[in-house]
Each structure stands twice: as structure tokens, then as C-alpha cells.
């Protein structure tokens, strides 16, 4: 089924802990701005977590979209944001999301270190994207400029400290 510019982009969130709940807040609070930037409506359509009752502390999360059925959220979204951590279950959900045609955003270093090549190959085969800038370099935005702004340049090396903790210590 072809999508038009008015069909909302369905965002599924896997994990509603500290990072997940704040990610949900940003999506909900900045929905209009995000939609304008993207050129299509965006909608948080599922939040998967182990303890749905815990989301009561986060009034911005619509309780009607909270579930313990992580696989359902992973396979019924256009974009899946994986914030559950670990590797085994995260791998299963990320690969299922990719197989269902969703692009994936993750901050999971362990997942990418252990299963990165498999995940990238699956994404390439399905024609979807994997975004992981938050997983590297303390979320310093250097992957996107390399991929988009410097695409015509031959970058032979990069020097710097790309670890958020180390940057914080050095700044202090």
C-alpha cells in the first residue's frame, strides 16, 4: 500500500525507562515541529515496556498505546526506537522490525558491537535505515555530517575524543 504525505509515520518505542520515557515526551511535545520538518504527520503509536504501570509517572504517554507486547510494537511501526538495552531480545526485536519494513533508531552499543553486521545486512536487504548516532561518541553529531555533508570528500582520518564521559571530565 502506497503512503501519501498525509499518512502519519507510525513511531514505536521499545522501552519506557529513563531514556525511553523522555524520548516519548519529546515526540509528543514536539509532534507539530517534527511533522513540519519531516513533511508528514508523525504519531507515537506504541510504547512497549515490561512494567506498563510504571508509565503512569509519565503523563505525556497515552496509556492506550502502552503494552508488554514488544514484538507487536516492533512489527507495526514505520520507525522503531529501540531503547531496551541488552543484546538477545533487542536483536530479535530489531530484526523483526527491519523484516516488517521499519527503519530503526538505537542507542544500544552492545547490540551494534555484537550484531552490527547482521543488522546492517538485514536493513540493506529490506531497504530501510539504521540510525545509531546516540550510541557513539556521547551523541556528538559526527556521523550525519560524514554521511551527508562530507560525502564528496575523502576523509582519511578523524582525531578527537569521542566519548561523552571523557569529554565531560576534560571540560571540567
Per-region residue spans from a language model:
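Active-site catalytic pocket residues across diverse enzymes, especially alpha/beta-hydrolases
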Residues: 27, 31, 123, 150
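N-terminal glycine-/serine-/threonine-rich beta1-alpha1-beta2 phosphate-ribose binding loop
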Residues: 2-100
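Conserved anion/nucleotide-ligand pocket segment
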Residues: 148-172
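A short hydrophobic/small-residue beta-strand
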Residues: 104-105
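Glycine-rich beta-alpha junction loops
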Residues: 48-53, 136-138, 161-167
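Short glycine-rich anion-binding loops that position phosphate/pyrophosphate groups of nucleotides
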Residues: 85-87, 110, 163
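Short acidic, glycine/serine/threonine-rich loops at helix termini
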Residues: 24-25, 57-60, 116-119, 141-148, ...
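Rossmann-fold NAD(P)-binding glycine/threonine-rich loop
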Residues: 89-100, 109-148
Amino acid at each position: 500500500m502506497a503512503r501519501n504525505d498525509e499518512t502519519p509515520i507510525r513511531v514505536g518505542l521499545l522501552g519506557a525507562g529513563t531514556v525511553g520515557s523522555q524520548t516519548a515526551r519529546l515526540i509528543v511535545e514536539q509532534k507539530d515541529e517534527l511533522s513540519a520538518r519531516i513533511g508528514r504527520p508523525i504519531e507515537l503509536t506504541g510504547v512497549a515496556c515490561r512494567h506498563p504501570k510504571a508509565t503512569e509517572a509519565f503523563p505525556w504517554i497515552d496509556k492506550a498505546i502502552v503494552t508488554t507486547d514488544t514484538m507487536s510494537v516492533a512489527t507495526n511501526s514505520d520507525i522503531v526506537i529501540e531503547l531496551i538495552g541488552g543484546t538477545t531480545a533487542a536483536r530479535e526485536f530489531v530484526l523483526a522490525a527491519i523484516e516488517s519494513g521499519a527503519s530503526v533508531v538505537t542507542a544500544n552499543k552492545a547490540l551494534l558491537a555484537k550484531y552490527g553486521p547482521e543488522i546492517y545486512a538485514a536493513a540493506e536487504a529490506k531497504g530501510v535505515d539504521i540510525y545509531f548516532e546516540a550510541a557513539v561518541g556521547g551523541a556528538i553529531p559526527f556521523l550525519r555530517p560524514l554521511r551527508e555533508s562530507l560525502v564528496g570528500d575523502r576523509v582519511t582520518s578523524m582525531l578527537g575524543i569521542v566519548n561523552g564521559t571523557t569529554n565531560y571530565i576534560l571540560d571540567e
